[in-house]
Amino acid sequence: MVLPKHMRLKGHRCFDFIYKEGSRFYSSSMVLRVTDANKKPQVKGKQSKTRPSIKCAISISNKVSKKSVTRNKLRRLFHHHLSLRLSNMSCDKEIWAFISLKPSSMKNSYSTLLKECDKLLTKAGITK
């Protein structure tokens, strides 16, 4: 399952901004970077008229698994999990979240990875 279009984080400027300005939250198998998108420099002529929301992206490198089938399965699993967890949330500001899986994450089961993801989202204050 793919993240809904309004929840996708895209564009290299967004990722650069998250890496420079975002807060990091660590677990044994992933890193969550979160930032308030309202702090981003405004692009001239482009004003966001949409309601505040949560946009996210997931990065799974070749170091996690050499097999693209496994990486895509993980990506789909996380997209489905995040779309269920974050779709009905209401927030007062726009939040950007970026999850990077560590190479050691394949030692854990899928359910353990999703639990760690939930813990990081709670730790970051995105979910309760």
From Swiss-Prot:
Example GO molecular function: tRNA binding
Q: Which domain of life is it from?
A: Bacteria
Cite a GO CC annotation.
Answer: ribonuclease P complex
Q: Cite the InterPro entries for this sequence.
A: Ribosomal_Su5_D2-typ_SF (IPR020568), Ribsml_uS5_D2-typ_fold_subgr (IPR014721), RNase_P (IPR000100)
Which UniProt keywords are present, listed alphabetically? Endonuclease, Hydrolase, Nuclease, RNA-binding, tRNA processing
Which top EC class is named for this enzyme in its record? hydrolase
UniProt similarity note:
Belongs to the RnpA family.
Q: What is this protein called?
A: Ribonuclease P protein component
Q: Which organism is it from?
A: Prochlorococcus marinus (strain NATL1A)
Its gene?
rnpA
